[in-house]
Design a protein with these regions (language model features):
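Active-site neighborhood of HAD-like aspartate-dependent phosphohydrolases
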Residues: 1-46, 181
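Conserved phosphate-coupling serine/threonine residues in phosphotransfer and NTP-handling enzymes
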Residues: 19, 114-116
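Metal-dependent phosphoesterase signature
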Residues: 63-98
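Conserved SAM-binding loop
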Residues: 20, 92, 110, 144, ...
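Short, acidic loop-to-helix structural element flanking the phosphoryl-transfer center
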Residues: 2-3, 8, 85-112
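Substrate-recognition "cap/lid" segment bordering the active-site pocket of phosphatases
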Residues: 117-167, 173-181
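Helix-loop "lid/cap" segments that line or gate small-molecule binding pockets
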Residues: 34-35, 54-68, 156
Length: 184
């Protein structure tokens, strides 16, 4: 027997990077590139543990770990975003588009909750896909990103559902913590 039937949830809230879109490797490469001028080599595993956190937070963590000043944060984030947008090779995971269409056809409310900026999300040229979501929550809409619960709480609020009526689909430790803190 299924302990968590999907029918108990009115809303499904999805992360984007690494859940719907195959973006993890492109993101890692962009972060690694952005730190080269500072003599910092980022390990793939280190980045994946931070995936989902706001970009400025990720930059701060790597700068502090390497005993560099946080005055470089904005330059690093800008370099990372520009590199990502110029070099990405975006695609969805298999079955994602069909899953979203099926959930909508079965009356589920859908939210996309991502730490990415609105500009970066729109830069993926998937507007028709994004239009299937009832709510989009991007990193620039919240004052505290993942692992803080604010992004998922805002998603539930905008969908007009309680947190117990929400199911979160996440891949990253920061996002999972965010969802748990939001009691989803």
């Amino acid at each position: 027997t299924n302990a968590y039937p999907l029918s108990q949830y009115k809303a499904i809230l999805f992360d984007f990077d690494g859940v719907l879109g195959k973006t993890m490797e492109d993101n890692y490469t962009a972060w690694a590139y952005s730190f080269v001028p500072y003599g910092v080599k980022i390990k793939r595993e280190e980045y994946f543990l931070l995936e989902g956190a706001p970009p400025k937070k990720v930059a701060e963590i790597f700068l502090k770990k390497n005993h560099l000043g946080i005055e470089f944060v904005d330059d690093i984030v800008r370099t990372k975003e520009n590199y990502y947008l110029e070099n990405r090779s975006f695609s969805f995971y298999d079955g994602v588009q069909e899953l979203i269409e099926n959930l909508k056809a079965n009356g589920r409310q859908l939210a996309l909750v991502t730490g990415s900026s609105y500009q970066r999300l729109m830069g993926t040229d998937i507007t028709s896909f994004l239009n299937q979501f009832d709510v989009l929550i991007t990193g620039d809409q919240v004052s505290q990103g993942k692992p803080h619960p604010e992004p998922y709480l805002l998603g539930a609020q905008k969908l007009s559902v309680t947190t117990s009526e929400c199911l979160v689909i996440e891949n990253a430790p920061m996002g999972i913590k965010s969802a748990k803190e939001a009691e989803m």
